[in-house]
Structures are given as structure tokens and as C-alpha cells.
Regions:
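Short acidic/polar active-site loop segments enriched in Thr and Asp
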Residues: 90-91, 193, 212
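Flexible, glycine/charged-enriched surface loops at secondary-structure junctions
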Residues: 44-49, 151-158, 253-260
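Metabolite-binding pocket within alpha/beta catalytic cores that recognizes anionic/polar moieties
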Residues: 1-142
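Conserved active-site and cofactor/substrate-binding residues in soluble primary-metabolism enzymes
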Residues: 28-32, 72-79, 87, 105, ...
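His/Asp/Glu-rich mid-to-C-terminal helical/loop segments that flank catalytic regions of hydrolases
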Residues: 223-260
Length: 260
């Protein structure tokens, strides 16, 4: 593919060049979270900041590790993963926020996705809808181990990936509200844990790239608990999810070294 960057050594969107990032990348959505995550690394350095894509690189347990933000939704997340892969990355850990869908999934909990419902559009331009969006078992196990070690309350299971934030929160206002509501009820009955906006695209793109990808989320709130009259505070502190993601990368580094 032609590189449209003025500096052709750098990827067009993320403005990063080969050699500037590690094989392990932690991927928040919000560029503002990158510096906070990078503080967990040794000697973190700001590599680039362009559009929604901010990248830091530092060291963790002797390995180069990067943090790159993706913005909101599947399209920009897929762009980031594609361009990071071209720079040498092959292991991706998504960290973000989600809304709980089951009564037992409470605000402040951590959800670790084993797979995603493909209710978004990006993944459909990579693979037929019959192809499942599943996380890497290695990354998922590393996330579970990190969550256990940190002592947080965590859940593993399927999440829903959507394109429209307000389609979830105000379905009655949408011309296709009947479809959104019916599918929401179906996902709940199937045990879907939470709703977010990126993981299906990331898991499918990872499959195309033969890369490893996993995802963990802070549960900010749960509208289903609110409907049941249960406690439903809004939680904004993502530190626990960040620690889980960083801990997972540590676990992956250790396992990868043991295999060498």
C-alpha cells in the first residue's frame, strides 16, 4: 500500500516509525489516558501525537512496551492496529470503559472480554459475519491472572461492540429503536456482560494480522441495575483497569521469555 505521509518512514495516521514502538502495545481510547498509563513504564517517551492517536514508548521488565490511543470506535482502532503492526507490534491489550448488562456486573468491576458481538461495521470489511470475534487465549489468561493478583472484582465473557453510543442509551429515539431494543434483550438473555465500542474490530483485525489481542474494561455504570432499582454509582477511576492491562503485559513478557 502507498504511504501518504510526508515522511514515508512514518505511518500516515499514527505518525510512528518502525523501531519506535515495542511488540507489546496497550491501547486506550482516550489520548488523555496515555501519559497516565505510560507512567507505569520505565523511561517513557512521547513518540507522536496526531489526531486521536498518541503514542508513548518505555520499558517494562526489560522489554520495549508502547501505549497508543485509538479514539472512539472500530474504524480508528483498526487503523491504529494496522499501522502499529507495520511497525513491528504483534500483541495488543485494549483498556477502556464499558456499561454493564448483567445485574452481577457492578460499577467499578473489571470485565475481561473473551469475545465480542459484532454489532459494528468495521469488522464486516475484514471477515464474513459468521467469523467470530474472539480474544487471544494467551492475552485473556494474562489479563485474568493480573486481575486476580490485583485483587479486583472481575468477570470474563462476551461483550457487545456497537457503533452508536446513543443508540444504546436512547434507543427509543432512534427510527430503528425496535431493532436495537430487541437485540439488546437477546444479548442479555445470552449472558452478554457489557457494552463497548472497539473490541470486535480489534479481535477481527488481530485475526487478519495473525496478532494477539485481548481487552479489559472498567464498568462505569450499569443501566440494567438501575432499571431493577439496584445501586448504580458512576465510576470514572480507570486505575484498576490500567493496572490489570499493565500486569497482563508483564505476564505475557514473562511467558514469552520462558518459551524462547
Amino acid at each position: 500500500m502507498k504511504n501518504y505521509s510526508e515522511d514515508t518512514s512514518r505511518q500516515y495516521h499514527i505518525q510512528v516509525a518502525r523501531g519506535e514502538i515495542g511488540r507489546y502495545v496497550i491501547m486506550p481510547g482516550d489520548p488523555g489516558r496515555c501519559e497516565k498509563i505510560a507512567e507505569y513504564l520505565d523511561t517513557p517517551l512521547l513518540i507522536a501525537s496526531n489526531r486521536e492517536f498518541t503514542t508513548y514508548t518505555g520499558m517494562l521488565d526489560g522489554e520495549k512496551v508502547s501505549v497508543t490511543s485509538t479514539g472512539i470506535g472500530g474504524p480508528s482502532a483498526a487503523i491504529a492496529m494496522e499501522e502499529l503492526s507495520r511497525c513491528g507490534a504483534d500483541t495488543f491489550v485494549r483498556i477502556g470503559t464499558c456499561g454493564g448488562m448483567q445485574p452481577e456486573v457492578k460499577s467499578g468491576d473489571i470485565v475481561i472480554a473473551t469475545g465480542s458481538i459484532r454489532m459494528e461495521g468495521t469488522s464486516k470489511e475484514y471477515a464474513p459475519i459468521e467469523y467470530p470475534a474472539v480474544a487471544s487465549l494467551e492475552v485473556t489468561n494474562a489479563l485474568v491472572q493480573a486481575a486476580k493478583e490485583d485483587g479486583c472484582t472481575w468477570h470474563t465473557g462476551v461483550v457487545q461492540s456497537k457503533d452508536a453510543f446513543y443508540g444504546q442509551h436512547e434507543p427509543e429515539a432512534m427510527p430503528v429503536g425496535y431493532e436495537l431494543l430487541n437485540k439488546w434483550e437477546a444479548w442479555k438473555k445470552m449472558g452478554c456482560l457489557a457494552s463497548e465500542m472497539e473490541s470486535a474490530a480489534l479481535f477481527i483485525v488481530a485475526g487478519k494480522l495473525r496478532a494477539r489481542a485481548g481487552a479489559c474494561f472498567l464498568v462505569m455504570a450499569n443501566q440494567e441495575r438501575e432499571k431493577l432499582g439496584l445501586e448504580n454509582p458512576v465510576v470514572h477511576d480507570t486505575d484498576m483497569a490500567v493496572r490489570t492491562a499493565v500486569g497482563a503485559v508483564r505476564n505475557l513478557i514473562r511467558c514469552d521469555k520462558e518459551r524462547e
